[in-house]
Amino acid sequence: MAQPAAIIRIKNLRLRTFIGIKEEEINNRQDIVINVTIHYPADKARTSEDINDALNYRTVTKNIIQHVENNRFSLLEKLTQDVLDIAREHHWVTYAEVEIDKLHALRYADSVSMTLSWQR
């Protein structure tokens, strides 16, 4: 009988990037918070101590950081899709979800967030 999927959660990854369409947003980095959920069958990793038997969340996180910090985005939707594409790129991934909060985007609100998901 197959085991339920393992779930990796990258919580509150705080980064700064260029996001938005207003001049101030184009010229100044803004704080964002990224949350990623990844499901994968960890059958080998459950009984192993070999990193090659597990989905390496450090590699995923480093790829997200590199992409977000080295690019500019007009739309939160595009940024969220790009991060989702990174989260789901390993062939073991069966489900991925990304939520990105753009902090202080609206007056009187802590943030505005966008959530996108993908399933194999």
UniProtKB/Swiss-Prot annotation:
Catalytic activity as recorded in UniProt: 7,8-dihydroneopterin 3'-triphosphate = 7,8-dihydromonapterin 3'-triphosphate
CC terms in the record's Gene Ontology section: cytoplasm; cytosol
Pfam families documented for this protein: FolB (PF02152)
CDD domains hit by this protein: DHNA_DHNTPE
UniProt entry tagged with the keyword Isomerase: yes
Subunit composition and interactions: Homooctamer.
Family: Belongs to the DHNA family.
Annotated protein name in UniProt: Dihydroneopterin triphosphate 2'-epimerase
Gene: folX
